[in-house]
């Protein structure tokens, strides 16, 4: 297996231009494909998950031109539901941001009835999709499980989504609601969605609603508990759509600065539609100096204090706090993060396991993690297993800010969202 050893870093200094957000990139591509008109999507992320979406759209008859550097995509919208040859199979890797929204969009009524199979890597077949399928079936969608109930692969027939009252469980993933919201306006009737349980990762729903509005569709909602969507609408191309920098990816650089230096990250700022921009506020609560601009966030180190906080609203960026906690004074508790367990891997167990290898004292609860700090000279060198999870690889790069080197196994797994992460991290790492 490929390994990457990072030597101890004495300080962090520099500026990072963020690649496009994964969540926004795949939403933008799907909305552009479904819309009337041609859309130029700029600052698109070039990564595995985006390639799976692009390949699926091509197989579904969508024409697009991708620039040589793969960051600009001109998409010719089809102005409604997808059409495809019966018997199509789409392989979506481990890309939840492709699997969930496509599963809903492919239920929309086509001119001729066809079946499509959605499948992916073994881990994708372990990632739950039952809450979305249950909701789609309430609207009249025709979806079957091909292997295990509640999990991909799925067989979908484009017989239509007929609106009405739909209940959806919001407690596992906001992507299920995102998928339903994005498909609903193209359905045959008006839809009222009621959320059961606590809706996790609300800021990701804000992203979805903001993007739908950019493509001409307004959704009414009542405190995130009920959503009203008119049927028989069309998305209208905004002609150009700029994908914001990935706020989750910003978290590693901002945390590195909070621990040992100063970094300016461009591509997101105070007006970002991504909830993970709030990660910078968490660093500020821990004691870091944070400066906000229109399109940048700057963080400078200061003495960090541990925190005890519900981080349900920023689950991806919260992982970075688990590492930052080692460098703070006092314990840190990250709460209400059960959905870490249904991501690319079971992130709660994975992070607890790898932190212990470093010598950290960690308590793993069902939906929380409690972490005690470590003195810089008390870190043990460890080989960090990454579980084919891009965010674990990026998080644990921060261990090099201690007095000990760290070895990351399978560093190439960052290709899911940030193929050049380690070279960017190296640029801001100073050793004198």
Swiss-Prot record:
GO molecular function: 3-phosphoshikimate 1-carboxyvinyltransferase activity
Active site positions, chain numbering: 316
Keyword Cytoplasm: yes
Pathway the protein acts in: Metabolic intermediate biosynthesis; chorismate biosynthesis; chorismate from D-erythrose 4-phosphate and phosphoenolpyruvate: step 6/7
Annotated residues for binding of 3-phosphoshikimate: 22-23, 27, 173-175, 201, 316, 339, 343
Enzyme Commission (EC) number: 2.5.1.19
Entry binding sites for phosphoenolpyruvate: 22, 96, 127, 175, 347, 391, 416
Keyword Transferase found: yes
Record keywords: Amino-acid biosynthesis, Aromatic amino acid biosynthesis, Cytoplasm, Transferase
Catalytic activity: 3-phosphoshikimate + phosphoenolpyruvate = 5-O-(1-carboxyvinyl)-3-phosphoshikimate + phosphate
A single Gene Ontology CC term: cytoplasm
Main localization (coarse): cytoplasm
Subcellular location(s) per record: Cytoplasm
Pfam families in the record: EPSP_synthase
Top-level EC class: transferase
Gene Ontology biological-process entries: amino acid biosynthetic process; aromatic amino acid family biosynthetic process; chorismate biosynthetic process
Similarity comment: family membership: Belongs to the EPSP synthase family.
Task of the protein: Catalyzes the transfer of the enolpyruvyl moiety of phosphoenolpyruvate (PEP) to the 5-hydroxyl of shikimate-3-phosphate (S3P) to produce enolpyruvyl shikimate-3-phosphate and inorganic phosphate.
HAMAP family, per database record: EPSP_synth
The protein's assembly and partners: Monomer.
Protein name per UniProt: 3-phosphoshikimate 1-carboxyvinyltransferase
